[in-house]
Amino acid sequence: QVNFSTGW
């Protein structure tokens, strides 16, 4: 799952 807050 991509964390769009960090980009990771």
From Swiss-Prot:
It comes from the Eukaryota. The modification Pyrrolidone carboxylic acid is found at residue 1. InterPro entries: Adipokinetic_hormone_CS. GO terms for biological process: flight behavior; neuropeptide signaling pathway. It is found in: Secreted. GO terms for molecular function: hormone activity. The modification Tryptophan amide is found at residue 8. GO terms for cellular component: extracellular region. Keywords: Amidation, Flight, Hormone, Neuropeptide, Pyrrolidone carboxylic acid, Secreted. This hormone, released from cells in the corpora cardiaca, causes release of diglycerides from the fat body and stimulation of muscles to use these diglycerides as an energy source during energy-demanding processes. Belongs to the AKH/HRTH/RPCH family. This is Adipokinetic hormone G. It comes from Gryllus bimaculatus.
